[in-house]
Amino acid sequence: MKFIFLLIPFIYSSFVFGFTINQDMGGFDNNNVNIEIANSDCSGAGFSTSKYSTLIKDAVEEYWNSVPTSALYLKVVGINTSIDIDGDQFSAAINKAKTGTILAGCNDDVTDFTDGSILGAAVATCDSSACKSVLILNAHANSSLKNMSDSEIKAVIAHEIGHAFGLGHSEYKHNLMYYSIGGKTQKWLGIDDIDGATYLYPHDAEIAGLLGSCGTIKDISKHKLKGSNNSIFRFLILFLIGLLISKFILKTVLSNRDFFNKFMK
């Protein structure tokens, strides 16, 4: 019996550590984040720029804007005809993003995009005032996107949007932010996805303190995934909470030993 209760703090503290945070960013300052679409050619990916806009809107509504515990709201403001990221590497493309926004586009010139299994990537940067991000899908002639269904492409887009607003990868396959979607259709968010979005953009700031690549979506965004030090700290806190819970339960059981002995028989 004591052995069972000793497991409680370990089990309790293990539930919330699947998501990681992009240390280069840590989230936008504002819960309401606009997504602008660059007026770049997406034909290599198998769709028009207009269709790309629709896919992003659908991805936003079907995934991230549907998290009830998160205050994050992503608004697709449409195609900005004055922005074109064709020919740009990420370092140049992100300079075209407005502060506090995500710029989404297609490109066949990013160095790693000659590998068709790399479907896209996202980069975020912050300074003393605010953050901005750029999301680019692979529109190279070799891109595997042209062979994917709309549902799969929306999952790819939603995955990269997750990076763009501050999430890293999850190690568990049932989550959208798992490092490889492997061509499957991810129709919903997993618990790590939900916890990560809630941690970064909670309705109540106090709630955050209680929470404890893809083919391949390759992480070429130079993410330094934060999780080691913070995860250890959160693990210790939650372990102690679990220990207190197990102590309370054990005390209750011992004080009612006769009843529980009859029950266990």
Task: Give a label for each model feature.
Residues V16-M264:
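Zinc-dependent metalloendopeptidases
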Residues M1-I4, K265:
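Positively charged n-region of N-terminal signal peptides that target proteins for export
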